[in-house]
Amino acid sequence: MLRELQKQRIKAFLVAPNNPWKILVLDSRTQQIIGPLMKVSELRECGITAHFLVTQERHPISNTPAVYFVESADGVLDDVLAELYSEYYLNFATSVTRGEIESLGLGLSERGLGLRIRSVYDQFVDFIALQDDMFTLGMKGSFIEMENPDTWRRMVMSVMSVFVTLGEVPFIVATDDDVTTQMARMLETKIRNTGVIKRGSKRPVLVLVSRSHDVITPVQHVWSYSALMNDLFALESNKITLKSGKVFDLDPQDELWRRNANEYFPVVVERVEKELLEYKKEMALRSIDEKTDKKVIQEALDKAPELAKRNESVNAHISICSEMVEMIKERAIDDFYKVEKGGHTNQELIELSEKGSDEDVLRLAILLLNTKDFDLIDPLLRKRKIKSKAIEFFRRHGGTRSEKLGTLYSQVVTSLMGNVKKLLPVKEQTPISSLVETIYGDIKSQIYSGLRVFDSMGSKSIYASEISRLVVFGVGGGTYTELKTLKLLEERIGVPIIYGSTEILNAREFLRQVEGRMSLD
C-alpha cells in the first residue's frame, strides 16, 4: 500500500506538465527514492524521455520542459540561467525553505526569467519504499548520529512524508527514552503547524523505537531469506551483487520474492525448486511442432511474455539461492544460527570457534554476554586473535535479548541445500515486536504505563477501534529480522503493520557503527 501510494504521488507530478515529452532532473537524494520505486519503462509512460542528475553537465534542450524532483533548490538557478530547458516544474522531496525560494526568485528576476518557473510544490515523499509494508530513510551512520538534533530534524521531515503519503494523522507513541520522546515532540509540532494532512475517522499509531532498546538483534545470525541475503550480500535498495558479479534487482512485484522475502531459507529453496519444476512442465506442455493446432500455437504465443518473466524470476532466485548455500557452507552459518537460537553445549562452542569468519565468531561472542558461558568469551576471541572495541560496548549495553527458540530439523526436501541444516524455528520474536505487542495490548486495555502519547489533534488517549494500522519506526536502524517478527505479530493481532527505520542494517554495518560510537567516547 505505502509503496503504491508513493508511486502514485510521484507519477502525478511527473505527468502534470501539459506536454507529452519532458526531461526529469534529480539529485542524489531523490535518485535514492525513485531508483527502487520506478522502472525506466514507467518513467517513459509518464512522458519522461531522459533523466539526469542536477550535478551532471548537460547540453541545452531548449524546446523541452523539465520536471525537477529534488531535495533542495541547489543548482536550479544555474540551470534556468543557462536556459537548458523551455519550462521548469519544481517538486521538492519535502518542502523548500523560504530562503531558497527568495534567492531563486531574486536571481531569476535580474535576468527576466522568472516566468520560466511554471510551478513549485512541496511533495512530502522523502522516504524509500522498499516494499508495501517497509520503508527506510536511507540515512547512513544513523546509529552513530541518532542523538544529534540535526538528525532528528531530518528524520521528522521524512517520517512526516510517510503520513502525508498515507493521508492519515498519526497518534505518536514514544517509549521512555529521550531520543524517541524528543523526536515525537518535534514531529507532533511539525504536523500541527504544517496542517497538510486531513484527519480521517481512522488513524495510524506511530511507535518510535530507539535502536538502543535492542542492540543484540542486529548482530545475531539470521535464517530468513531477505535477512540472510542482506547479511551475505548487503541488500541495498532492493538490489544485490553476488560474489560471482551477477547483479539482481529484487522487484516487489515478483511473486517469488513477494511471497518468500520473510520466509525461512529452507522453505524458500524448496519453493524455488518446485517453481522451477513446474515451469519446466509448463514449457514441455507448450512445445510446438509442425503438427500443433493453430489454437494451441496462439495460446502459447499469448502466454510467452508471462512465461519469459517467470523464467527470469526462477533463474534469478536459483542463482541467488545457490550462491547463498555455498556461503552458508563456507561460513557454517547454519551452525552459528542453531547455537545462538537453540542453545548449545561447551563442546559445540569449541567446535564452532574454529568455523566461520572472525566476524561470525565476534557475533557469537556478543551473544554469549549475559549467559552462563560469558567466561568463554575472552578465550574464544583470543583463540581467533580477534580484537574489537565493540565487545566492550555490548558488555555495557547488551541488556535486552531475543528469547531462545525451540528449533527443529524440518521435513523440507531440497537437493540444492545439500548438507546445510534445514532448520525451522518453532516461533520467533524480537524485543521490538514484543514491545509493539505490549503497546498494542496497553492501548486495548487503556493502560499507558511507561508510554507517552503525542497527538497534533490534542487527544491524550487512543482507542483500538480507531486504529487503521501500526507504523513502527526504528531510530538508529532496523533489520529484516524485525520486519519478519512484526509481520508475524500482524497475523496475531489482525492490524496491518508498516515497518520503517533510518536505515536497514546488517551485522557488519552495525558493528562498524558501534566501533564508531566507541571511538567518540
Curated annotation (Swiss-Prot):
Query: What family is this?
Result: Belongs to the STXBP/unc-18/SEC1 family.
Q: Its Gene Ontology biological processes? A: protein transport; vesicle-mediated transport
Fetch the PANTHER family from UniProt. VESICLE PROTEIN SORTING-ASSOCIATED (PTHR11679)
The organism's taxonomy opens as: Eukaryota, Fungi, Fungi incertae sedis, Microsporidia, Unikaryonidae
Gene3D superfamilies noted in UniProt: 1.25.40.60, 3.40.50.1910, 3.40.50.2060, Syntaxin Binding Protein 1, Chain A, domain 2 (3.90.830.10)
Give the subcellular location.
Answer: Cytoplasm; Endoplasmic reticulum membrane; Golgi apparatus, Golgi stack membrane
Domain of life of the native organism: Eukaryota
Task: Quote the Pfam families the UniProt record gives.
Answer: Sec1 (PF00995)
One Gene Ontology cellular component annotation held by this UniProt entry: endoplasmic reticulum membrane
What the protein does? Involved in vesicular transport between the endoplasmic reticulum and the Golgi.
Region forming the signal peptide? none
> Per UniProt, which keywords does this protein have?
Cytoplasm, Endoplasmic reticulum, ER-Golgi transport, Golgi apparatus, Membrane, Protein transport, Transport
Q: Its membrane topology, per UniProt?
A: Peripheral membrane protein
* UniProt source species: Encephalitozoon cuniculi (strain GB-M1)
Protein name in the entry: SEC1 family transport protein SLY1
